[in-house]
Design a protein with these regions (language model features):
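An N-terminal, well-structured beta->alpha segment
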Residues: 2-83, 87-88, 168-189
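Gly/Ser/Thr-enriched, mixed-charge loops and adjacent short helices
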Residues: 15, 128-222
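Short glycine- and Lys/Arg-enriched binding-loop motifs that mark or flank ligand-binding interfaces
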Residues: 26, 92, 125, 192-194
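Active-site flanking residues adjacent to catalytic metal/cofactor-binding acidic residues
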Residues: 29, 68, 118, 193-196, ...
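Residue-level "edge-of-site" marker
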Residues: 39, 98, 120, 220-221
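Short, acidic Gly/Pro/Ser/Thr-rich loop/turn segments
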Residues: 54, 123, 198-200
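Ferredoxin-reductase
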Residues: 59-136
């Protein structure tokens, strides 16, 4: 694995080819960077290779559920991450766009040990990041993040055979089914559902309607 550089000049051949990762993006419980100022797509591939190497190092079954939030660049980020995971010999189950809790739900629904959710959470556009874990229902804590950081930044990722990719449809529907269950409103209720044009806009209105709530939608477009 090529050792990532902390900085590469943008709009150059090297920026398109060489992994760049700002070390401070590795935090206690997840990873977060400004994109593309602090991490580039090759850098995200290096992160995937490092995460896959960590999974093998821990002796965990090499299967992972992967998802992304609604940001228009998150799909590219996820695909770069997946490339690194596959390079590390990981079987990838791509569930598409999702909420973070839905990605964690997918670990149990698909019976896979690991998860990686491409999201910058509440950060504004221009940020990206990854929430990850491989000891369900736990996500990475300080020890796991420190180990991952060292693997990635030291260039210790190991390529292995056996990587694969599968797009898994239907997880959103299963997630909503699980949330709603057999719940029904005991009395009529009218609510304004305003998600701020976030990822929840693809879930919340349908969820409330299925519960029997009259929904007034506001700012629910991605």
């Amino acid at each position: 694995m090529t050792k990532p550089l902390p900085e590469v000049s943008p709009n150059t051949w090297n920026f398109l080819r060489d992994p760049m990762i700002t070390p401070t993006g590795f935090r206690e419980y997840d990873a977060r960077w400004k994109y593309p100022e602090e991490i580039n797509l090759p850098g995200m591939t290096a992160l995937g290779l490092g995460l896959g190497t960590q999974i093998h190092k821990r002796g965990i079954e090499p299967v992972i559920a992967v998802a992304n939030d609604y940001r228009d660049y998150s799909l590219s980020i996820k695909q770069a991450l997946i490339l690194g995971l596959m390079q590390a010999g990981i079987q990838v189950k791509d569930i598409g766009p999702a909420l973070s809790p839905m990605a964690y739900f997918a670990q149990f629904h698909l019976d896979v040990p690991a998860v990686a959710m491409v999201t910058a959470s509440h950060n504004p556009n221009g940020w990206t990041g990854v929430k990850m874990g491989f000891e369900r229902p736990l996500t990475h804590g300080p020890d796991e993040m420190a180990e991952l950081r060292d693997i990635v930044l030291n260039g210790d990722g190991v390529a292995r055979p056996g990587g694969s990719y599968e797009f898994v449809d239907g997880v959103k529907e299963a997630y909503l089914d699980d949330l709603v269950g057999d719940f029904k409103m005991s009395r009529p209720l009218k609510v304004v559902c305003a998600t701020g044009n976030g990822t929840a806009s693809a879930f919340a209105p349908e969820l409330f309607k299925r519960m029997g709530v009259e929904v007034v939608e506001s700012h629910n477009e991605l």
